[in-house]
């Protein structure tokens, strides 16, 4: 179990250090936000799954999930601990890091989602034009 002030850090193999650093520092524009305050664990899990599926469908890659620090929950940081665990189980989640203070600090996480096949192709084509 995490503590209210603990940071959440998770990065899949293959995620470039520069990409992870940029996420950790809050440098990517936040494209969507989910607030889990006042939700039960079951409601929160359902909301997280639904939210991330919607984001993936809409080609949204950078989101913030506000879970709260859980200072008054019993046990402390219960929601935070579960959110950290759930996100690692979702294969479309590339990396996760606790947010900067201006986005919620240790009561929120940045989530970077996998790029769609379409977006990967666009990036590849853009780099090909630049190189060739």
Residue ranges of predicted features:
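Long, charged, low-complexity intrinsically disordered regions
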Residues: 1-62, 69-132
């Amino acid at each position: 179990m995490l503590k209210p002030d603990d940071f959440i850090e998770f990065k899949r193999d293959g995620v470039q250090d520069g990409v992870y650093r940029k996420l950790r520092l809050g440098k990517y524009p936040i494209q969507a936000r989910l607030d889990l305050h006042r939700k039960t664990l079951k409601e929160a899990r359902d909301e997280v799954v639904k939210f991330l599926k919607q984001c993936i469908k809409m080609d949204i890659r950078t989101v913030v999930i506000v879970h709260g620090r859980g200072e008054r929950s019993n046990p402390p940081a219960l929601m935070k601990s579960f959110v950290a665990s759930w996100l690692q189980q979702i294969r479309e989640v590339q990396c996760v890091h606790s947010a900067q203070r201006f986005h919620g600090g240790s009561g929120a996480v940045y989530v970077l989602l996998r790029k769609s096949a379409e977006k990967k192709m666009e990036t590849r084509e853009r780099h090909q034009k630049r190189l060739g």
